[in-house]
Amino acid sequence: MSTPPARRRQLRTWSPAGKQELVQAVTAGSACGPELLDLASNDYLSLCRHPSLIAAAEAQLRCSGVGAGGSRLVSGSRPVHDQLESELAQWLGRDKVLLFPSGFQANLAAVKALANRHTTVVADRLIHHSLLVGVQASGARLRRFVHNDLESLERLMLRCRSEHPDAHLLVITESLFSMEGTSPRVHELATLCERHNASLLLDEAHALGVLGEGGRGLGFGERRVTMLSGTFGKAFGSGGAFLACNGELGEQLLQESGAFRYTTALAPPLAAAALAALELMRNNPDWGHTLVQRSNTWRDRLVEAGWARPTGGGPIVPLLVGEDQRCLNLQRHLELSGLFTAAIRPPTVPEGSARLRLVLHRLLPDETLESLLRALSDGRVS
């Protein structure tokens, strides 16, 4: 094994505790540890335990059973799949939506639909691993631009056009980067792609439900985004994923995508829960905006407490610590203080940039920030 012992990860098992936003570590013998406030999961809108999602999943269990039992093109399609695809397409202003069992599969399918060995992919340096695997599987050439730097992107596009004048260009980025909490200027990026005749794939996994008009992501209303990928495993509080695009690309995915055709369909109860989450988002369009405002208050207070300002402006608040062991020690101290956080270390992030990935949720108690600031202050001293 090439991973240094100090950086080997270990699985920890967690169980939801009695109240919303609380979790407990499960140890050997199924013993549960103390209740901790969850500042680590991607359940941004606090929907994974929402009564409406649970009721929708339970009703679908009684109707369709647990699993789909087949691929969408054989026997796995259910009415709930069709309804979710239709309502998502309407919500996002797209012609076609197709569901996938996981975000990894959706991203793999997206890249392979838009790129081949004649394509040059120009990708943000920090895109998700699933997108990089998709590029590799497509056979396309890969070039990387400086994170969220449009000047770097344009220089690279001009160079690629010079080196391969007839190649198709595909630009790949994310609307909310999971470890930095940062976002690109999507409108300007789309204008750049239009200028250089490039397709644009936008991964909205962490943005949907939180960013953009009514939580519909940063690609909403921007028709120059060729394809959107999204997930139900974060703000939607369920599981699975989807791609949204025009009708022609949607038909291409349906007919040609192995990641769509050769996999068991999304479990119907998860689709039903995602549909219930979508209804809640439509009825509460300010949830995301309120969460973003709260996250910026956290950033301001962390700066006042002597920390470097966490990057970005959404619910992912990366607190830069630097050295690996110091970050782990601080994480353990916060856990002893009743706060569950994630220490993110290389190779997930660059060397010397270990961080606590703090994640805000809609239903976090008002006093959470004060508890965090006290624990961080004590952890620094110790």
Predicted features, each with a name:
Residues S2-V66, A198:
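N-terminal "arm"/small-domain region of PLP-dependent enzymes with the aminotransferase-like
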Residues P51, A55, A59, C63, ...:
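PLP-dependent enzyme catalytic core of the Aspartate aminotransferase-like
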Residues I54-S102:
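Conserved N-terminal alpha-helix of the aminotransferase class I/II PLP-enzyme fold
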Residues H289-N296, V303-G338, S353, L360-R362:
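Conserved PLP-binding catalytic core of the aspartate aminotransferase-like
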